[in-house]
UniProtKB/Swiss-Prot annotation:
Name of the protein described by the UniProt record: Tubulin alpha chain
Superkingdom of the organism of origin: Eukaryota
Catalytic activity: GTP + H2O = GDP + phosphate + H(+)
Enzyme Commission number(s) from the entry: 3.6.5.-
Site description Involved in polymerization, residues in chain: Y453
Amino acid sequence: MREVISIHVGQAGIQVGNACWELFCLEHGIQPDGQMPPDQAGRANDDAFNTFFSETGAGKHVPRCVFVDLEPTVVDEVRTGTYRQLFHPEQLISGKEDAANNFARGHYTIGKEVIDVCLDRIRKLADNCTGLQGFLMFSAVGGGTGSGFGCLMLERLSVDYGKKSKLNFCCWPSPQVSTAVVEPYNSVLSTHSLLEHTDVAIMLDNEAIYDICKKNLDIERPTYTNLNRLIAQVISSLTASLRFDGALNVDVTEFQTNLVPYPRIHFMLSSYAPVVSAEKAYHEQLSVSEITNSAFEPANMMAKCDPRHGKYMACCLMYRGDVVPKDVNAAVATIKTKRTIQFVDWCPTGFKCGINYQPPTVVPGGDLAKVMRAVCMISNSTAIAEVFSRMDQKFDLMYAKRAFVHWYVGEGMEEGEFSEAREDLAALEKDYEEVGIETNDGEGEDEGYEADY
């Protein structure tokens, strides 16, 4: 079996995790207590869902995951929630005091008290696997636990499980909506670590997902539950080929191979289509080419970043439901002819497609309509650099005055780490710029270069 262990860190990671496991259980017909009703059990002999669930002797299905937070409230919600019987009590780990939005607390002081318990638990999960494929990590980079403790966890996983792939779903701070003043510090410090210790990082940003909920689902005031259920659909589509069978299955390590041209350039944009409310879906015919086009719409990107400002290096399209390869090839051919969607010219093919026959499942009482087919796109675009430069500007404004730095230094961090992380990000921005112009046609901003041709 090719198992995957999910690690949910901090409030954002855990709440996204709740939405994901709720959806996975619905998709596999597993009840909130982990049992699979007898009528489902016959259907389940394909066993593919064992990549995410392990089955106990008593016929109970337990998710292969760990929930960690440095303070108890969010984990307690899982302990008392609908799915409390699904998880093994040891998988829900909480500390006593929180990281207080401080990277240094999560990474150094408070984090190191909890890290060994977590790694021990992960070790038990890993021993229970026959062929561990890798880890999915869920966290936010703006807070203290997700950023500081999340990075500590990734660093330790790199040591213990060097060759296993690590995919990270990071909730990135939004341009306008902020939840903490020190977000820029935490983000820059944690990206410094993400650069080295993850193989693929998928950027999600609340503001972008708010806008999608408002625009496409007509929700006036989206809640975190609305957002997380949408994120869960993306994660479900990505992992569907591990959990069900299909025409073109895509492995976790395949993402890496197809999406990451250079080790550092591994920050991905994601989009999902169709995001439609039940009232609208009733009147629309959502063909393969239509959903493919809307996956490339800038407004449907799950991070505030306009791919028209950059070029695509590679793209992974994961279709699910009633889709045949012929339609996919036609849709991709149409995309390639569009002038608005530009690829770097050193990567002429640029598309990796996966098809899975299991149609998307929706949460009863949720906002999304039940549709026959859906697509999730993960793309590597040079435009993501604008997300970093936005963050770096905010970081510079604060760091020039050394504002709030004493909180970090007081927790045992050195000031040099700030400048080191910031330089690393400056180098990353430069990398993205160079990837875009590495060939003959030059880039818009590089006029002198272009004049020669």
